[in-house]
Design a protein with these regions (language model features):
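Glycine-/charge-enriched secondary-structure boundary and capping motifs
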Residues: 1-8, 12, 59, 74-179
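Gly-rich Lys/Arg/Thr-decorated short loops/hinges at beta-loop-alpha junctions or inter-strand turns
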Residues: 6, 45-63
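Glycine-rich anion-binding loops of enzyme active sites
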Residues: 1-46, 161
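Phosphate-binding glycine-rich loops and adjacent basic patches that engage nucleotide phosphates
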Residues: 35-42, 58-66, 107-108
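Short, glycine/charged-enriched secondary-structure capping and boundary segments
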Residues: 24-25, 50-51, 101-103
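C-terminal transmembrane module of polytopic alpha-helical membrane proteins
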Residues: 65-73
Length: 179
């Protein structure tokens, strides 16, 4: 049991058709997907999972929420949900955890390039910057998704593609995925 206070914000809404909900994991092993990061990655580790497990203790400021980008993301998803195969937040564990959870159970791997995410690979993988979403779109819809997000004013980074070998590769290096 943690002894640190945790502020919790809850949001409740009504979804008219639950069949239109975007899953947080890949829905089909038969498709090829392009993985895209929406939003800016910053050097923000205050209160993060990494900070907690590294023994550094929880300290510093939490990631700053970009309300303007949150609004742009909400508009993007409201108007484009049909083209998104899966989406995952990056709030707990950063990009590394989001990619793992997206792939889990799909028998898919991925080939990722982090160059456009952040200059520092560690920050790119583990930062918990707010106002970011990892999305998977079928590869034939990737260009259209990038165009829609860019025209909505959202920073877009194409990370790479899924593979059928079940292996995650980051910058050409294999990453062991353990359940």
């Amino acid at each position: 049991i943690r002894d640190r206070p945790t502020p919790v914000v809850g949001v409740l809404g009504v979804m008219e058709d639950v069949e239109k909900a975007i899953p947080h994991a890949l829905p089909s092993a038969d498709e090829q997907y392009t993985l895209i990061l929406l939003g800016e990655t910053k050097d923000e580790f205050g209160g993060s999972v990494w900070q907690d497990i590294s023994g550094a203790g929880l300290a510093g400021l939490p990631p700053q929420v970009d309300l303007a980008n949150e609004a742009r993301l909400a508009e993007f998803f409201a108007g484009n949900a049909a083209g998104i195969a899966a989406a995952h937040d990056l709030s707990e564990g950063g990009l590394s955890q989001a990619v793992f959870e997206l792939l889990l159970g799909s028998d898919k791997g991925a080939e990722l390039n982090l160059e456009g995410v952040h200059a520092d690979a560690f920050t790119a993988l583990f930062s918990e910057s707010a106002s970011r979403v990892l999305v998977a779109v079928t590869s034939d819809r990737a260009e259209a998704a990038v165009e829609r997000a860019t025209s909505a004013g959202i920073l877009v980074t194409v990370l790479g593609e899924t593979t059928n070998d079940g292996v995650l590769r980051v910058a050409g290096e294999e990453v062991q995925m353990l359940e």
